[in-house]
From Swiss-Prot:
It is found in: Secreted. The keyword Nucleotidyltransferase does not apply. Contributes to protect fish blood from freezing at subzero sea water temperatures. Lowers the blood freezing point. Binds to nascent ice crystals and prevents further growth. Pfam families: SAF (PF08666). Belongs to the type-III AFP family. Gene3D superfamilies: Antifreeze-like/N-acetylneuraminic acid synthase C-terminal domain. PROSITE patterns: AFP_LIKE. It comes from Lycodichthys dearborni (Antarctic eelpout). This is Ice-structuring protein RD3. Residues 65-70 are annotated as: Linker. It comes from the Eukaryota. The lineage of its organism: Eukaryota, Metazoa, Chordata, Craniata, Vertebrata.
Length: 134
């Protein structure tokens, strides 16, 4: 039995998902697989999602099964991030960009790390922009 993504709180329509809004639970019927949680961060829901509701692919804008496979998405700034700011989840989103930056699977690892320069809205985070990122 694989876990699915379940709403950990009421998520209003058009809200960009953050890690604290989601949890992994084994539910029937299955929804979006729990291992997709890092890729869902920054994606918007297209309807209000009540607490405890299983997230289905059609509830998340631009979510298609398969397009969130690892390595496709990069971490992108969700806002202007001033120099020396410690990163938080709300500052980052996952997007398919070219050239590729830090993989979206790394978002949780980036939390608390500082940027060594100003990062603009929609700018791709590159490894050399984050202090002590390896």
């Amino acid at each position: 039995n694989k876990a699915s993504v379940v709403a950990n709180q009421l998520i209003p329509i058009n809200t960009a998902l953050t890690l604290i809004m989601m949890k992994a639970e084994v539910v029937t019927p299955m929804g979006i697989p729990a291992e997709e949680i890092p890729n869902l961060v920054g994606m918007q829901v297209n309807r209000a999602v009540p607490l405890g509701t299983t997230l289905m692919p059609d509830m998340v804008k631009n979510y298609e099964d398969g397009t969130t496979s690892p390595g496709l998405k990069s971490v992108v700034a969700n806002q202007l991030i001033p120099i020396n700011t410690a990163l938080t989840l709300v500052m980052m989103k996952a997007e398919e960009v070219s050239p590729k930056g830090i993989p979206s699977e790394e978002i949780s690892k980036l939390v608390g790390m500082q940027v060594n320069r100003a990062v603009y809205l929609d700018q791709t985070l590159m490894p050399d922009m984050v202090k002590n990122y390896e």
